[in-house]
Amino acid sequence: MPKITESNLIAGVQIVEPSMHGDERGFFIETYRREWFPLGREMIQGNRGDRKAGAIVGLHYHLHQADYWYVPYGTCRVVLHDLRTGSPSDGVTQTIDLGARPDGTHDHRGIFIPPGVAHGFASLTDMTITYLVDNYYNPNDELGVAYDDPAIGADWG
């Protein structure tokens, strides 16, 4: 069973540390399971993005879509900013590094991002990100905030 913790900065953001099983042949890891998020909605689409080191993607947000991100290769810095009026963490910014660590290990954490939380990432190395979403693409629910907005004050690495 994975260890799932709620962010201590942004309400509703959940960080998953999945269990890993392996031997000299390699390893197996379950990166997502619906039952881990009993209050979440069903993820209906999976996507993959490959980025070169130095790329910045975001910030964007959705009013009607949650995301679940996992980085199987490389390292990224995830930047989150709570835009939900009335949320206990409204206006809070958080950064989380996912993927490979400087010591050569890989943390294998995933992150659940609820609707209304702006999200983006900087590729600290060449990387791959997979993301599951609970709604199909809707251009009317693709909203954005400038990645360098001083009110957000994000550290992109």
Residue ranges and their predicted role:
Residues 1-107, 128-157:
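Non-catalytic, conserved peripheral segments adjacent to functional cores
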Residues 105-125:
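Conserved SET/PR-domain catalytic core that frames the SAM/AdoMet-binding pocket
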